[in-house]
Structures are given as C-alpha cells and as structure tokens.
Amino acid sequence: MQLLRLIVPKRATTGGMARIAYVRVAIVDVGANTLRLLVATREEGRLVALREQRVQLSLGEDIEHSGTIGKEKLAEAAAIAGAHVRRARKLGCDRIDILVTSPGRQAANGRELVSRLAETTRVPTRVLMPEEEG
C-alpha cells in the first residue's frame, strides 16, 4: 500500500473546494522477483486494497548472472505488465502507473525494461529510487 501513496494525492483542490482526485488506482510493481498488481480505492481518507495479484518472474536472477535482463524475460515482463494493466482497466481504475524497483536500477539494460513496459502498456512508467521504496 505504501507504493500507492506515491501516485495518490490525499486531496486536490478545485475552486477552493477539496475533492478526491482519484477514486480507484492501480500500481504495477516490477520487482526483482515478481510483477505485482495492486488495485485500491480511497474510502474515508484511507486507501483500501481491492485486489492484489503477483506473478513470479525472477528478473533478479538474470541480473545476478549477467548484469542484464535477457530478451525472453524482457518480453515476458512486458506481457505480464500488459495483462495487469488490462485487468486494472476492467476493474475501473482511474489511474494506473508502473513502478520499477531494483531491476530498473541494477540491470545494465534497465532503461530498455522501462521503455518496453511503457511502450507495451501505454501507462506512466518510472524507476523508483531506493528511498521511495520504504
């Protein structure tokens, strides 16, 4: 849930009146071991998880062995992220973001991973800094 706080403002103001900016949001968390979908909504000022799904991919194994993510795993990561984004859209998410953790920072081809995910899914994609991971 902490990752969701990176994309969900507590409140937005319009014309002096406070309103909630997004009703339902999703994060695709691309980590060293899994690609996780987390869908949440804001209820009474707090985030409530509606769905969480993980798919094991082990990008970190490739990075550990060769310093890069292999072409097959790049393609598989893009396919899994695409499936997560489609699922989030079916669940009515107002905002979807992809947040890449250590694979984006540690792999020699981390930028290629981020580009591939963004091109495949057409949603905002970025690498988190270690201090943002919490």
PLM regions and their residue ranges:
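Nucleotide/phosphate-binding catalytic cleft detector across ATP-hydrolyzing
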Residues: Q2-A32, L38-G134
